[in-house]
Curated annotation (Swiss-Prot):
Keywords: Methyltransferase, S-adenosyl-L-methionine, Transferase. Pfam families: TP_methylase (PF00590). It catalyses: 2-[(3S)-amino-3-carboxypropyl]-L-histidyl-[translation elongation factor 2] + 3 S-adenosyl-L-methionine = diphthine-[translation elongation factor 2] + 3 S-adenosyl-L-homocysteine + 3 H(+). It comes from Methanococcus maripaludis (strain C6 / ATCC BAA-1332). S-adenosyl-L-methionine binds at L9, D85, V88, S113, I114, L164, A207, H232. The lineage of its organism: Archaea, Methanobacteriati, Methanobacteriota, Methanomada group, Methanococci. Pathway: Protein modification; peptidyl-diphthamide biosynthesis. Belongs to the diphthine synthase family. S-adenosyl-L-methionine-dependent methyltransferase that catalyzes the trimethylation of the amino group of the modified target histidine residue in translation elongation factor 2 (EF-2), to form an intermediate called diphthine. The three successive methylation reactions represent the second step of diphthamide biosynthesis. This is Diphthine synthase. The keyword Methyltransferase applies. Signal peptide: none annotated.
C-alpha cells in the first residue's frame, strides 16, 4: 500500500489526524521537499509528531528513489509525505498513477495547500484563472510564461496566482519583491503593456501560519516593501466584485 499524505503549509501542527493514524501503521515514511517546504518547522519536529523516522528523497535522484518507494509499496505499507496537498504537483500525480498501474493500493490524504489558503484573501476562488510560476532567471534561461498567463487571464477578467520559485536544496526562496521585479523585466522586454509599476497586486506571505501577511498596492510601492520571511506568492487581480474590493481594503495592509 502507498499512502500519499500532505503536511499542510506551515508547520507540524498542520498534520491531520488521519495522517497521524496511518503513520503509526506504515512500515516506512518517505518525504520530498523540492517542490515545496514547511518554513515554520523542522524535520525533527515533524518526525516527533509522527513518532517515526522520515527518509527525505534526494532531488537529484528523484526518479530512481520514487521508483524504489513504489517497488517497496508492493510488499510493504509505505507513506509518501509532501508539503501542501499530495496531489497538487504533477510529479506526485505520476507517482500515484504508476503505483496503480502496478496494482498497488493507493490512499490519498488531502491537506491544506496554497490553492485553498488563498481563500484568506477574500478573492473569489472561481474567478482565478490559470496559475503560473515565476522562476529565478538564469544565464540563457528567462521564461516569459508568467507574463503570457497574466495577459490571458486579464483579458478574461480573471485573477492570476503567481507561485514563486523554491530551491529548497539551496535554501533559496524567491521573495515577492524578486517576483514582481522579474515580471517588470519581462514587461520591459515585451512592451505589451500588460503590467507596470501602476498595476495593483496582492502579496500573501506565510500562508497557513497563524499570522500570515496580506499586502495590497501598486507594484511600484510593493516592490521595495519588507514582506518578512517566506514563503511568498503574488496575485495579479482581474476584474473585482465590490465584495472583493472590500476584502482588499479591510483584510489587507494597503501599501
Amino acid at each position: 500500500m502507498l499512502v500519499m499524505a500532505g503536511l499542510g503549509l506551515y508547520d507540524e501542527r498542520d498534520v491531520t489526524l488521519k495522517t497521524l493514524d496511518f503513520a503509526k501503521k506504515v512500515d516506512k515514511i518517505y518525504a520530498e521537499f523540492y517542490t515545496a517546504i514547511l518554513t515554520g518547522t523542522t524535520m525533527e519536529k515533524v518526525e516527533e509528531t509522527l513518532q517515526k523516522p522520515i527518509t527525505v528523497l534526494n532531488r537529484e535522484k528523484v526518479e530512481y528513489e520514487t521508483n524504489k518507494l513504489i517497488e517497496e509499496a508492493k510488499n510493504k505499507d509505505i507513506m509518501f509525505l509532501t508539503a501542501g496537498d499530495p496531489m497538487v504537483a504533477t510529479t506526485h500525480v505520476d507517482i500515484a498513477v504508476e503505483a496503480r498501474k502496478k496494482g498497488i493500493e493507493v490512499v490519498i490524504i488531502n491537506a491544506p495547500s496554497i490553492y485553498s489558503a488563498i481563500g484568506i484573501t477574500g478573492l473569489q476562488l472561481y474567478k482565478f484563472g490559470k496559475t503560473t510560476s515565476v522562476v529565478f532567471p538564469e544565464p540563457n534561461y528567462f521564461p516569459e510564461t508568467p507574463y503570457d498567463v497574466i495577459k490571458d487571464n486579464l483579458k478574461l477578467g480573471y485573477h492570476t496566482l503567481c507561485l514563486l520559485d523554491i530551491q529548497a536544496d539551496k535554501e533559496r526562496f524567491m521573495t515577492a519583491n524578486e517576483g514582481l521585479d522579474t515580471l517588470l523585466k519581462i514587461e520591459e522586454k515585451r512592451n505589451e503593456k500588460v503590467i507596470s509599476g501602476e498595476t495593483y497586486a496582492a502579496v500573501v506571505a506565510r500562508a497557513g501560519s497563524t499570522k500570515p501577511g496580506l499586502y495590497y498596492g501598486k507594484i511600484k510601492d510593493l516592490i521595495n516593501y519588507d514582506f518578512k520571511s517566506p514563503l511568498h506568492c503574488v496575485i495579479i487581480p482581474g476584474k473585482l466584485h465590490f465584495m472583493e474590493e472590500d476584502a482588499l481594503k479591510y483584510l489587507f495592509e494597503n501599501i
